[in-house]
Amino acid sequence: MTKPNKELSEWIVPIDESDISSITLGELIDSAADEFPDIEALVYSNQPDVKEIRWTYKFLSDASTDLARGLLGEGLSPGDTVGVWGPNHPEWILTEYALAKAGLKMVTLNPLYKDQELIFALNTVKAKGLIHADNIGGIPASDLINTIKGEIPSLHHIHSFDKGLNQLLVNGAQSSIQLPAVNSKDIFMIQYTSGTTGMPKAAQMTHEALITSAKNSHIRWKVTNNQKVCHGFPLFHIGGSACMTLGAASMRSVSLPLYIFKPGVTLDIIENESCSMFIGAPVHLTAMMQDPSFQKRDLSALKSLVVGGSNPPVELMKQFSEAFDADVTNGYGMTETCGLSCTALPTDPPELKAIAGLPLPGVSLRVVDHNYQIVMNDMPGELLYKGPGLMNGYGNLPDGSSGINDDGWFPTGDLATMNSEGYINIVGRSKEMIIRGGENLSLIHISEPTRLLSISYAVFCLK
């Protein structure tokens, strides 16, 4: 790949139809089952906090069809929104595919939500249904739900992952309800952003955008059919429910999600299941390295690591590579881009694999200053995104806007640089930009010397 503009921080590429997955989630899981019915799609093993399962693609395809019919049979209609609330339970993924087949919308809910957060999240999208884990944080979820459901007028259908879904599966298997036609451009998933600049924003994402971003990231990482990939991303997050879940189905690989991250348990999974890839946050790798059993482990099957969620220093990436004896790559993405938008090439040197990397196929990027002008190479500015993974917009902004600029570019809010080859490095948030004498200054660039000198505390004064 060659950067179209060698001087300006701009990567503009045409969208090739071959880079877009114009299918629905239901079509994705069904096609995987048709091609490889007996390959394991989802495995939970060596995790004492959750039941052990080994679901094939055929099982997941058939069960999601039954559950979709069960949901429609109890009164939900295509277009209704259903919340999913809980940790990384296997039934979460089954529910995700079932909701997609039923033409329902899915709003993912953080298991750390308390009463007011849950009320806000469900009322904002006028949720008709809620599917939840039996216990969340060691507390029966039904206790909280019973206290708040009266404050959510639209909510009429509530089921737990265990007993509730089992009955819906039985009902659906006996039903002759015809599943609706679903379009790949229909909005399917709604996720709330962190809300660091105000109230949480409801990002709306289509089937097509979700699958396209997930598949293209896995192609870049060279994930293969039947490859075992363990990951530590929460399913309520875009990294878990989209990138890892839909990427695995796209490549027909085996997904091994962590129910709750525990370093020793994660090492058990990687070792006993012979996982060849682990994807998670830098803190996951650090915790595993510090586990007392780490040096005794046989991790010879593990060949590659992908980290996301932060921008680790090159030195730390090298430590990961040496400790696990595996290739390590960083990646950059966000909810609004349906997951990954940049990651390095497998052939890149370590210093390039430590930064955000190159745009995925079909993704265009710009780095602009406070006047919306494209900056020169290696100058910091706000990163703008345009591409097939872009959300349809926020669904709850007070002014009714989508959050996407009129020219189709989405302002990520992230501060970045782009080099002459198109590689992106995230250096902060745009609100941290300091403008001095017309020059954009990043706080990371200003504070970097203190890190190199191991200075713990410093005060910076700019004149």
Regions found by a protein language model. Name each.
Residues 23, 74, 85, 374-378, ...:
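Conserved ATP-binding/catalytic segment of the ANL
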Residues 444-463:
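Single conserved hydrophobic/aromatic residue that forms the stacking wall/gate
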Residues 22, 37-40, 160, 173-192, ...:
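Conserved pre-ATP/AMP-binding loop-to-beta segment of ANL
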Residues 1-55, 59-74, 78, 147-154:
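N-lobe entry segment of adenylate-forming
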Residues 38-97, 114-119, 166-167, 181, ...:
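Conserved AMP-binding/adenylate-forming core of the ANL superfamily
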